[in-house]
């Protein structure tokens, strides 16, 4: 409601999307009952100068944790009807099946929400098994994802210690947040970090046309080719692009290297290269064998 809804141009569609937002509450009771697409159609938002994305969230029940309430009807499992089976099934089973279908069939990227136990009445250890299962499934499928550590104290030493521990354990970014107090800029930062987990399939480099006219084997063209090949060998996902640019900036003949555009949907990044001052005239002088300024 802070970042996506304001970018829906049609007022009626915007109000309908607001009415369809999932409910939330404190305590142990499960609020989500089925996978829900919010909004119904993807909305384009800007994440800064270099990236525009189309966003649609799928809210899932997830995997139930010990102590959660809402999956039982008295002493018996709560039975529910789903689109995936003719007969009613236990709510717990339906929740897991729906979550798996979303992860496998409908999502392009995942946001795993876990907690240190400070935002519910349940201790941290109750969440660990479900957390590990979801992360393992995403890793097995190769889906890019990050983890949100929901906590009442995102800046405390104990939270930072747990955040760092989870990051090392799972090998993905872990962001400590207080979900109830998130601002638009916080959400934008989360989306940026999440999108940068997409695999990098293509790096596009832009530089002056005169460089392309140089003969094969020319020292500058060869040096540029070697530098770009070296960079390509070091990058696997969009998050690695800035590191690659840092390497290029140390190249003697380049004055500047910067990200021109990030295209998460294509798994591509566009990098602009500016050559050192005077290099054009230096090359021209070498070519005609006389000084040109």
Would you name each region that the model predicts?
Residues 126-132:
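Charged helix-capping and loop-helix junction motifs
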Residues 192-196, 203, 208-293:
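P-loop NTP-binding site
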Residues 69-121, 136-138:
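Inter-motif core of Ras-like GTPase G domains
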Residues 66-70, 121-126, 156-160:
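Conserved ATPase-coupling elements of RecA-like P-loop NTPase cores
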Residues 46-51, 102-106, 137-142, 167-168:
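Conserved catalytic network of the ASCE P-loop NTPase/AAA+ motor domain
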Residues 133, 137-146, 151-217:
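Canonical P-loop GTPase G-domain recognition
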Residues 1-84:
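Conserved G1/Walker A P-loop phosphate-binding module
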Residues 62-64, 116-119, 152-155, 180-183, ...:
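Conserved nucleotide-binding/hydrolysis micro-motifs of P-loop NTPases
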